[in-house]
Curated annotation (Swiss-Prot):
Name of the protein in its database record: Probable glycine dehydrogenase (decarboxylating) subunit 2
GO MF term set: glycine binding; glycine dehydrogenase (decarboxylating) activity; pyridoxal phosphate binding
Provenance organism: Nitrosomonas eutropha (strain DSM 101675 / C91 / Nm57)
UniProt keyword Oxidoreductase, yes or no: yes
Source organism, top-level taxon: Bacteria
Enzyme class: oxidoreductase
Length: 483
């Protein structure tokens, strides 16, 4: 039920004093509304009940384990929210004089420096407002680099078949042809295929490490050498940075540019359509092209670097700095952790993943790439179970909802049939992981004894089955008061 359907004429929320006439007179006539907005008329109590009921219908990291692979659904510390919402931050206008915002600029500068240090990059820009935009920035800078050298024949970007879908989309948006290379049977990029793919047309390689298969690319140094010798650059998709934070730096692996998903590794909130943030770091070769503004610290004063300071920059990617509130939350998070805490992130994330992998293997679940240690996530394949019983990965995922857990990522990566991509972030306790194992055992037993119970799940959700085809073909995105 929509909030508008609760609306009753003249049923108002709390009132406030109307604007005085002088205040109204300050608004130009062409900016004044000609008619009242179509807002619902609902009491405060009904409003609270409506949104509370909606929240109870949704899964959330605040209520239960959320093992969504390749998403790093870690807990968002409330201290980060509380400090980022201090009036001194919220009341700061982005266009206010720099000397009135030195505290905020100091936070942004220190965040740039911390991200430089943990990634091994030479400089960082915070302006990107999403992971996909961070990718676009990175490949745009690679293009600018080659064009500045007069190397216009480089028209191809190499991408492994296990990559996130945004990688090829980004390359195409930047005008490149995508060259896909396969994964070998151990889960690594096929080196012979990479060597065959590089050429004078190679602009770069986009790589996630650890990959979406949940394994660390063992030959990343050799991959870097092959691409660089061909004149290309390496792009690091930072989606899985959480697995190696503080243990190995992308810069040391040979990458020239990286984006970092703050909503994953640095614990800013997920979802809701935003706001997001994905700072971009670069090696020396791409320094001139970083998007602006960037915070500089000169003679004890913080200031923005703009087009005048960086004439080769690819320009601005957001209205101003980007999503300041998200960046503040990430800064507070890393300061709360400190250097030692940041080292433990990868340790605990990897420990949780390998513990869960071992427990599910004991139950009889088939693990993809069984000879490899999980980096931070791992893949269960249900192909054999499906062949024997007809129960699919999607069926199991739906049944997990009845057990009180959000489902893992299903059917990604596409390389593994009937797969569940499971990622327990470092913030989950052993007790939580054990409860998840119990739920998985219960479902495995149900597959043997009452498979229809699993096939027809979920049974306890407010909405049981969704018509995916109807939802895609008959979009209903805007409320209309006329019905």
């Amino acid at each position: 039920m929509l909030i508008f359907e609760h609306s009753r004429k003249n049923r108002l929320n709390y009132s406030q004093a109307p604007a005085t006439r002088p205040a109204k007179n300050n608004i130009p006539d062409n900016l004044k509304r000609k008619s009242a907005p179509l807002l619902p008329e609902v009491s405060e109590m009904d409003t609270v009940r409506h949104y509370t009921r909606l929240s109870q219908k949704n899964f959330s990291i605040d209520t239960e384990f959320y093992p969504l692979g390749s998403c790093t659904m870690k807990y968002n510390p409330r201290a980060c929210n509380a400090l980022a919402m201090l009036p001194q931050f919220l009341s700061r206008h982005p266009l206010a004089p720099e000397d009135t915002g030195q505290g905020f600029l100091a936070c942004m500068y220190e965040l740039q420096e911390i991200l430089k240090d943990v990634t091994g990059m030479s400089a960082v820009s915070l302006t990107s407002m999403a992971g996909a935009q961070g990718e676009l920035i990175g490949i745009t800078m690679i293009r600018a680099y080659h064009e500045a050298r007069g190397d216009t024949e480089r028209t191809e970007i190499i991408i492994p078949d296990a990559a996130h879908g945004t990688n090829p989309a980004t390359a195409v948006m930047c005008g490149y042809k995508v060259i896909e290379i396969p994964t070998d049977r151990d889960g690594d990029v096929d080196m012979e295929a990479l060597k065959a793919a590089v050429s004078p047309r190679t602009a770069g390689l986009m790589l996630t490490n650890p990959s979406t298969l949940g394994v660390f690319e063992k030959k990343v140094a050799e991959m870097s050498r092959v691409v660089h010798e061909a004149g290309g650059l390496l792009y690091y998709d930072g989606a899985n940075l959480n697995a190696v934070l503080g243990k190995v730096k992308p810069g040391d692996m040979g990458f020239d540019v990286i984006h970092m998903n703050l909503h994953k590794t640095f614990s800013t909130p997920h979802g809701g359509g935003g706001p997001g943030a994905a700072p971009v770091g670069v090696a020396d070769c791409l320094l001139p092209y970083l998007p602006i503004p960037i915070v500089a610290h000169e003679q004890g004063v913080y200031r923005w670097l703009t087009e005048k300071d960086r004439p080769q920059s690819i320009g601005r990617l957001s209205a101003h700095m980007g999503n300041a509130g998200v960046l503040l939350r990430a800064y507070i998070y890393v300061r709360l952790l400190g250097a030692e805490g940041m080292f433990r992130i990868a340790e605990y994330a990897t420990l949780n993943a390998n513990y869960l992998l071992a427990e599910l293997r004991k139950l009889g679940f088939e693990i993809a790439y069984p000879s490899r240690r999980a980096s931070h996530e791992f893949i269960v394949t249900m192909k054999e179970i499906k062949d024997k019983t007809g129960v699919t990965a999607m069926h199991l995922a739906k049944r997990l909802l009845d057990k009180g857990f959000h489902a893992p990522t299903v059917y990604f990566p596409l390389l593994v049939p009937e797969c569940l991509l499971i990622e327990p972030a470092e913030t989950e306790s052993k007790e939580t992981l054990d409860r998840f194992v119990v739920a998985m055992k219960e479902i495995l037993d149900e597959i043997d004894t009452q498979p229809e119970m699993v096939k027809t799940a979920p049974h306890n959700m407010p909405l049981r089955k969704i018509d995916d085809v109807k939802a895609a073909r008959e979009l209903d995105l805007v409320w209309n008061p006329a019905g």
